[in-house]
Swiss-Prot record:
Organism: Candida albicans (strain SC5314 / ATCC MYA-2876) (Yeast)
Family membership: Belongs to the cut8/STS1 family.
Transmembrane segments annotated in the record for this chain: none
Keywords: Cytoplasm, Nucleus, Protein transport, Transport
Assembly behavior: Binds the proteasome.
Protein name as catalogued: Tethering factor for nuclear proteasome STS1
Length: 327
């Protein structure tokens, strides 16, 4: 009995005849009972051995390749790291400017603020700074006062009377700064600190012009301040001119008065300041008159001496050594 829809190979579904197939006898000992099965097992065993050998060879080749690749990568990474170490630069970090370079980069206002802050923090350095700092020249001192004077003029109001109280109050802080600077610089050019009379008088002359060229404000406070300032400056003129007065026969003052033409300049200052410099003018006149009197007396004395020497004549030939020996 056969299953439906199933047939053996070589059979016809519609044919009911049986076909006999001759097979070797199962009783023959020389013939394998399952020849195809034996061959199949031998072939499979050989194939498996070959596959194992191929797999082993492949694994070995893969292992060698992987080892070679790993070694090459290690060598390359070692070479790369060694090159990187050779090219490596030291670490650089930011740092402030050295003090000389920092001072060099500062402008005038910042440098001035730096010194003032330094004195505020360390007040004991004030005397040292005064001692080691160079003295300003006359030109620099006058220029500084001129700048402060210009600051006063630049702050005057445009649409207002220049001499009014409003104008004065507006420039008052700058006026106070100017007069304070004048006082400080005048003291710097007085003896015995300043030994050169010419320098002192030149500075006083320029400073006096700046003071009386200030706007003539009608404010009473300003008028009093300006008058007092001119009186003090006139006294400083006398201090400078009389510094060597104790020296007997001193002609330096007269020489300076003549070379600088001080008498003419003082006349101008006295006229503009309403006779504030009258004492200075009288002092210079007195010095010039004394010098002229001394010069006239010297000339007169030299003339009298020459006339007396002309009247007294002695013949010294009789008292010569030759005449004495001949006797």
């Amino acid at each position: 009995m056969m299953s439906t829809n199933f047939q053996w190979p070589g059979t016809n579904k519609n044919d009911n005849t049986e076909v006999s197939v001759e097979t070797p006898s199962s009783t023959d000992p020389h013939v394998p009972r399952y020849p195809f099965t034996a061959m199949s097992h031998a072939t499979a065993s050989t194939t498996m051995k070959k596959r194992k050998r191929d797999d082993f060879d492949g694994d070995k080749s893969t292992t060698i390749t992987m080892n070679t690749t790993t070694t090459r990568k290690y060598i390359q990474s070692s070479l790369g790291s060694s090159k990187f170490k050779k090219a490596k630069t030291p670490k650089i970090s930011g740092q402030p400017l050295p003090l000389p370079r920092l001072i060099e980069s500062l402008d005038k206002s910042n440098l001035q603020k730096l010194v003032q802050d330094l004195i505020t923090v360390h007040p004991e350095l004030q005397s040292t700074l005064i001692k080691i700092s160079p003295r300003p020249s006359i030109q620099d001192s006058i220029q500084l006062l001129q700048d402060k004077f210009d600051m006063i003029i630049s702050h005057l109001p445009y649409k207002c009377d220049v001499e009014s109280d409003y104008s004065y109050l507006r420039i008052k802080p700058h006026l106070q700064e100017f007069l304070s600077s004048v006082s400080d610089f005048i003291l710097n050019y007085l003896p015995p600190l300043e030994t050169n009379m010419t320098h002192s008088l030149q500075f006083l002359h320029e400073t006096t012009k700046l003071v009386y060229n200030l706007p003539n404000f009608t404010n009473q406070e300003f008028q009093y301040t300006k008058s007092s300032a001119l009186e003090q400056i006139a006294n400083c003129w006398l201090i400078v001119l009389s510094q060597d007065e104790e020296k007997e026969g001193n002609t330096d003052v007269v020489k300076v008065i003549q070379e600088l033409e001080l008498l003419e300049k003082l006349h101008e200052h006295n006229e503009i300041s309403f006779n504030k410099f009258e004492k200075v003018v009288d002092y210079c006149k007195d010095k010039l008159e004394q010098h002229e009197l001394i010069m006239n007396n010297n000339e007169a004395g030299s003339g009298v001496t020459s006339s007396i020497s002309d009247l007294i004549t002695v013949d010294y030939s009789k008292y010569s050594i030759a005449n004495t020996t001949s006797i």
